[in-house]
Every structure is written in C-alpha cells, then in structure tokens.
C-alpha cells in the first residue's frame, strides 16, 4: 500500500516555532511528528510514502532521507502552495503504480487510525473515495459530513457554523482514494479537496465514510500541540520516564511520569520534572526549577528556580533565574528571557529576541 502525506503547510498558527522549522519536524515526546506518522503507517502495511513538501522542504528531506521504518520515501515538491487537492494531482506519477487505491493523510494529524481496516472497508464498499470520520462536540473547525445508513456521504460541508452543521461527524484527515480521482483534480493550480473534489464525489454517490474511535488530534494550535505531546507521553512513559542516552540527572531530582528526557540532557538537584513534559536533547535544567505540562526543544537552557507550566520553549532558548512561563506561552528559538521575568496568557516571543520585562497578557514580543 502507498500513502501521500501532505507535509507542505506553513504552520502559521504555531509561530514563532514554525518560523524556523516545518510543523512536521515539531518534536512530540522528542521525536518529530512526521516520524510518528510514518511509524503508524509502517505498522499497517504501507510500504511507500510520498511526502508532498513545500515550506522548508530541505529540512524534511535531510532528516528523513529515502526510507524510515521499512517504508520507502519519495518526495513531491510543490513549486507553489497547491492547497489540499493540488498536491494529490502533483504526485500522480509517484502514486499510480500497481495498486488502484492509495491513502492521503493530512500530515499534522496524530491518530491511531487502523489504516489496513480503512483500506478493507473502502474496497468492500466499492467506493471511489472513503474518508475516516470522527465524532466531535464542536465540528465548526472541520469538514462535516451528512451520512446515510450505508455509510454513503450525502453532503460535505467545510467548517460550517455549529448550528448549521449537518452532524458531528468530521473529516479526520485520512482518506483512501482510487486512481480515478486524479481525473477530476485540475493540474497546476490550487485546489481544495474538501470544497471542490469531495462535493463532486458526493454528487456521484461514490464518496463513503468510516467512523473510528481512539487517539485523534489535529495539531493546529499551541494547545493542540501540547495536548498531543501529553497523549503520546501517556502511551510511552506513563509508569517511568522515557530516557535518551547519556542523561545526567541528579539523584535529588524528582521526576513525575509521564516524562520524556532526551539524550545528553542535564537535570540538576531539587528540580521537579513532570508530569506531561518533554525535555529535548542536550537541554540543561538547573537547580530548583520546575517544568510541568511543557515541551522543551533541544539545547535550551533553564536557569535555577525557573517555573515552566503548559508552555513551549524553542531550541537554544535561554531562561534566566526565577523566570516564570506558563499558560501556552511560546518562546522562539534562541530567545533570551532574563532573570525574574514572568510571561503568561499565551505570550509569543520571536526567535532570538531578548525579553527583560514581564508580559502578563496575550501579545507577540518582536
């Protein structure tokens, strides 16, 4: 089986972190998001993944090369942003070998979807396209379907007002498509598969859905990213911390799982790490500091008696003595937060910016 992973997005809602890396390279439990996606595909029989890349494509290529977990990797490079449908047409030559159906995945979705089961359902239904469906309380952020008793999708409505949604079943960002779908996607232009292609298939009565339960999260906003990290930590490190190589940790440090600590990290005495925290490779956490519910990118420095809660700290950032950062604040790569500064209420600090006064309401420090 083959899969196309849409990996070209700009990740604008995750700035400033996405200013310096593509979203697919964001670490979750100290592994890139894309690594988790490809591993999940490999476990369900996918043998080839085509990555539709655009923004910072070279970073992805350098890190993933031509194979991972036994899955061969090829690249389809968009010369300009082509939406969610255009990349499918662009990758046609890489996907039209042998099999008559293939997967398409939104690359920023983390899920436990059983790909092999979805493929079997698609074949059994005789569908031209099958969408994995997920029930949510608020469908207004997503594509919403109206479905009949035969799992046939009658209508597809992209991001409706909540009172106008035909159901609470949303497009989970994973599809099985037949080769015939290539024929209805125009070449060389920006196309929305949700707004332009799925309605055509629904009108032909060849679009079906398959509901699933289990892990599913769309990593679109900072809180979603923090939540995804927590969910994966629960799976891999719920009873004891997941440690990389050559971690130097004081016997007087307190670790509350689930926690992941990367290779070469240094954890000093009287620190409290966890629960639900990822400490990246070569991070230093100094005496008396506390890190809870947060993601610390590699090579960051956390000085003594700092407090970090529900925040994201970029690569190489430096946090001074008695710094307090909480409530979904994002610190860009190589930023410097000076001693005694407090940041709260979703403050965003741009890369390499130095902050020497507290900011207590939502804003961007540029």
Regions found by a protein language model. Give the residues of each.
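A short, conserved acidic/glycine-rich loop-to-beta-strand motif
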Residues: 125-135
């Amino acid at each position: 089986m083959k899969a196309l992973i849409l990996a070209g997005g700009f990740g604008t809602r995750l700035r400033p972190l996405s200013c310096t890396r593509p979203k697919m390279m964001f670490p979750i439990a100290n592994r890139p998001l894309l690594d988790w996606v490809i591993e999940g595909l490999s476990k369900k029989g996918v043998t080839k993944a085509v990555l539709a890349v655009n923004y910072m494509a070279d970073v992805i290529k350098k890190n993933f090369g031509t194979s991972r977990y036994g899955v061969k990797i090829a690249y389809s490079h968009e010369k300009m942003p082509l939406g969610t449908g255009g990349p499918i047409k662009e990758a046609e030559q890489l996907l039209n070998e042998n099999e008559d159906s293939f997967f398409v995945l939104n690359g920023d979705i983390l899920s436990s979807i059983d790909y092999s089961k979805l493929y079997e359902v698609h074949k059994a239904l005789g569908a031209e396209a099958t969408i994995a469906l997920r029930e949510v309380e608020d469908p207004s952020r997503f594509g919403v379907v109206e479905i009949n008793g035969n799992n046939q999708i009658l209508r597809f409505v992209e991001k409706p007002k909540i009172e106008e949604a035909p159901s609470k079943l949303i497009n989970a960002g994973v599809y099985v498509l037949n080769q015939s779908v290539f024929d209805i996607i125009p070449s060389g232009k920006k196309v929305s598969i949700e707004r332009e292609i799925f309605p055509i298939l629904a009108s032909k009565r060849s679009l079906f859905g398959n509901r699933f339960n289990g892990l599913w999260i769309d990593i679109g906003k900072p809180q979603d990213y923090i939540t995804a990290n927590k969910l994966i930590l629960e799976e891999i490190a719920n009873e004891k911390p997941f440690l990389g190589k050559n971690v130097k940790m004081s016997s007087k440090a307190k670790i509350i799982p689930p926690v992941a600590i990367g290779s070469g990290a240094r954890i000093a005495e009287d620190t409290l790490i966890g629960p639900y925290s990822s400490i990246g490779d070569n991070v230093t956490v100094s005496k008396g500091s506390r890190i809870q519910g947060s993601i610390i990118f590699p090579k960051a420095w956390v000085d003594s008696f700092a407090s970090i809660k529900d925040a994201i700290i970029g690569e190489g950032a430096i946090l001074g003595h008695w710094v307090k950062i909480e409530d979904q604040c994002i610190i860009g790569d190589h930023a410097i937060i000076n001693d005694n500064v407090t940041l709260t209420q979703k403050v965003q600090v741009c890369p390499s910016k130095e902050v020497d006064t507290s900011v207590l309401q939502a804003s961007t420090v540029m």
